[in-house]
Amino acid sequence: MSYLQPPLFTTVSSDWVAPDLSTLPSWEGAKRVAIDCETRDPDLRKLGPGAGRRPNSYITGISFAIEDGPGGYLPIRHEGGGNLPLEGVLAYLRAQAKVFTGDLVGANLPYDLDFLAGDGIEFERVRYFRDIQIADPLICELHDSYSMQAIAERWGFHGKDEALLRAAAVDYGIDPKKDMWMLPAKFVGKYAEEDTRLPLNILRRQEREIDEQDLWGVYNLESKLLPILTGLRRRGVRIDCDRLDMIERWALEKETEALAQVRSITGHRIAVGDVWKPEVIAPALEHIGIKLNKTSQGKPNIDKELLGSIDHPVADLLERARKVNKLRTTFASSVRDHMVNGRLHGTFNQLRRQKDDESDGTAGAAYGRLSSEHPNLQQQPARDEFAMMWRAIYLPEEGQHWASNDYSQQEPRMAVHYACLAKDLIGHQAWLSAIEARDKYRNDPNTDNHQMMADMAGIKRKDAKEIYLGLSYGMGGAKMCRKLGLPTMMAVRGPRFQLFDVNSPEGQRLVAEGARRFEAAGPEGQALLDTFDHKVPFIKKLAKACEARAKAVGYITTLSGRRCRFPKDKDGNYDWTHKGLNRLIQGSSADQTKMAMVACAEAGLDIIIQVHDEIAFSVHDMKEAAEAAHIMRTCTPLELPSKVDVEIGQSWGHSMGWDGNPPS
């Protein structure tokens, strides 16, 4: 059935014709080839790439360009006609994929590779997968857009010529991008061929900057990781649909029970699903004497923090009802929406990048960290009572075990590693304290960072942890005191940078002279911070060294050579530089995880997903899980040993210790 009504009158014409299949070139021996797919993908924005997994999701045409050589657009499924023989095109491309050993170039290559694999075109001998939308955020991750057009303009190109395409779309009454599959191929061919040649031209200019910034190490790492992440999405994660059904029933039952108890106590009825409506739950809270503030719209202001602060069974019941409702309506529903034939095909974002649907804005995380979407597998229930039960819906491959291999205290170890290398920057005494920490790890790789620092400082573990995290994340003294549960004070700074309480005589004098008031650590908190800094000086000294480096050059360099950059403020100075240490250890930890994924994949290990500090595998036995852990520990030599905790089970939840019984 045709979806397209040919126009009665046309304002455009095209003399483009598809190439003769018999004249197409061999890719064997080519240094670089660019490739791009035009697709029909109606659910892309809502559910992510379909790649042939969902109905009406398929390639309509494939374009290629050999660097400094021939190329062409090969239409195969255009609704408007002008297609080449489907099997002939696929046979040609499958044959080229088998012999091509150079670099494959493109823009948003994972999207194209996923669709191509659906048609049996798989590039298993490629040297590197060079994606200009990976290269560009490596060169600078601070841009607002990483669309092909924005990247082209940054590198001095006009971008894609869409004039003919858009004019034809107007004649046919369709959207020129999402409905391109409807057009006759003759109106798409020229656009598609230029679309493929452009990344080759952009990449040449990007590579000069990659040379200038010495980014080849991290670019090669990301280029090796790209097909691995594409493979994770293509295969997907198995879902236990029976357990998913059970969890939905359990969550509905628990929500109903909680709301029934609220009614029993307060006399106010709240329907299932209404627990998120402030105006509905407000009467129950007011019944127990809670005075509620109003929003600017005049509605009761009831958020998570408020419910958590109320010491009363009704608040506890409402909070529980919200949690189990979210489990059912957000998490379970998202799995059902995205699941295809019992598997979830989520997208793993390597870097900040343009969204697959080419809409405004970007997807992905900064500083090299992986993120995921459609659905977000990195944002699953983790600390709730039902977290293990929920994660039990995620299964390994048939007949295998789920192995959760989790880096233990990855970022604190990275901080010790860098402090050991920074003697000239942090000073001899601070360096000695770092060496002391390093040696403790070398003597016992199971050393707990926060307890070690507590012992070194002679303070409680909880306090040592909060201070370490505060220094690592660039917190000020006042914020750290609030984290520690200690009082702060309003202070002013004297001429020699001394702090004075605003209520002291000197403080009042400085205020009268116009000194700026600000919140600072109180005496008790400051004494604790001073003790930590005196006994474990390398953390603060390293933080100051990172801040100084960021202020001077505008970036921090991580383990792989990645540059984590800082924006400039209105005065032209680098901003947020107090986050320098955080960028260093977060970015380097991300590098370590990515290096481990590449090394594990090259060793033939079967990665399922990556979440935070964890890489999950489908393994035959504990020996295989231990092999993966060994690679994770040793793929990046550090000044101290890395630790990887290994747990296996019949599902993700079972690997966490779930006993198979729902919470009461």
Curated annotation (Swiss-Prot):
One of its GO terms (biological process) is viral DNA genome replication. GO terms for molecular function: DNA binding; DNA-directed DNA polymerase activity. Coiled coil: none annotated. It comes from the Viruses. This is DNA-directed DNA polymerase. It catalyses: DNA(n) + a 2'-deoxyribonucleoside 5'-triphosphate = DNA(n+1) + diphosphate. Disulfide bonds: none annotated. SUPFAM superfamilies: DNA/RNA polymerases, Ribonuclease H-like. SMART domains: POLAc (SM00482). Transmembrane segments: none annotated. It comes from Pseudomonas phage M6.
